[in-house]
């Protein structure tokens, strides 16, 4: 069986005396793709925030790439996690160029600040954009892209 990339074991997330996620067990293997569906307020976003290391469980164990959340450096895990959503698109600075959106993924940030990037970072981003046939958008700002283009840039990221 392919290796586990994500494992939830009896995971609970509690807010304001209410379980948002209630004793969830879930395993994702390397060769699997999942869709998370449910009504508003069911905990879908919370589950994805756990998987993206943006949130820790109240109880239970979340393991990502064999690393237990809470016992591992999330800043080392995050570059290995790909995540695309409308919520993430809203967090990308609209004035950020497409090449920067893709380039900053290697550092688990959404948008450039004052960090210095190396030539290899830009070459890698340009290569990925070309592979996804998005190289014509390199100098466009993220906020000027259509929703479909934004999603493709996030996936390339």
Descriptions of predicted regions:
Residues 37-39:
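The feature captures the beta-strand-to-loop junction immediately N-terminal to the Walker
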Residues 86-144:
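ABC-family P-loop ATPase nucleotide-binding domains
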């Amino acid at each position: 069986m392919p290796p586990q990339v994500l494992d939830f074991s009896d995971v609970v997330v509690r807010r304001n005396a209410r379980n948002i996620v209630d004793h969830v067990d879930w395993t994702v293997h390397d060769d699997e793709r999942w869709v998370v569906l449910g009504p508003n307020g069911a905990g879908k976003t919370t589950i994805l925030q756990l998987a993206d290391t943006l949130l820790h469980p109240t109880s239970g164990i979340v393991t990502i790439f064999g690393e237990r959340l809470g016992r591992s450096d999330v800043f080392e895990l995050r570059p290995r996690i790909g995540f695309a959503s409308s919520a993430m698109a809203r967090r990308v600075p609209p004035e950020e160029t497409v090449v920067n959106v893709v380039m900053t993924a290697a550092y688990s940030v959404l948008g450039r600040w004052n960090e210095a990037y190396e030539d290899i970072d830009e070459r890698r981003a340009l290569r990925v954009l070309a592979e996804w046939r998005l190289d014509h958008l390199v100098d466009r700002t993220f906020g000027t892209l259509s929703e479909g283009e934004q999603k493709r840039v996030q996936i390339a990221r």
